[in-house]
């Protein structure tokens, strides 16, 4: 999988301790639509892309006694839906792990419904939808158990 980074123990993006995997690509729709340079992850745009074997990521996750979920985010996971599905296939089938997997997307649900359908067979998937819109008050999301930056953003278990 092509990634920009991994945080083995993340406590801010989901209610459970997570491995946070930074995806590699984004079209920066939040900036384009707001007309502002507002991307919370713009530093990642210049980070190098690295390729890491799915098995290495899964083993790293499973060997950590703290983490209880995996979160994909940082840039746009839906830009790598094929790679994420391949990862999930190994995670669920080969390693028999049913832990929560969360995807933070800037897309609205109706924009990625085909991609959502690809995720359903893997079970226990949560997707955070909605672009970052600057100058909004953060709100608590009950599904994720964390505050989201814009009031149009929400998570759904699919």
PLM ranges: what are they?
Residues 19, 37, 55, 86-88, ...:
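Generic preference for flexible, low-structure residues
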Residues 26, 77, 132-133:
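Short glycine-rich anion-binding loops that position phosphate/pyrophosphate groups of nucleotides
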Residues 22-24, 41, 89-92, 121-122, ...:
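Short, low-complexity, polar/charged sequence segments that are solvent-exposed and flexible
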Residues 22, 69-74, 102-104:
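Short, conserved beta-strand edge motifs with alternating hydrophobic and charged residues
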Residues 66-91, 138-140, 144, 157:
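Conserved glycine-rich "GG(E/T)P / GGGxP" loop and the immediately following alpha-helix
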Residues 44-59, 78-121:
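Canonical radical SAM enzyme core domain
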Residues 11-52:
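Canonical Radical SAM [4Fe-4S] cluster-binding loop centered on the CxxxCxxC motif
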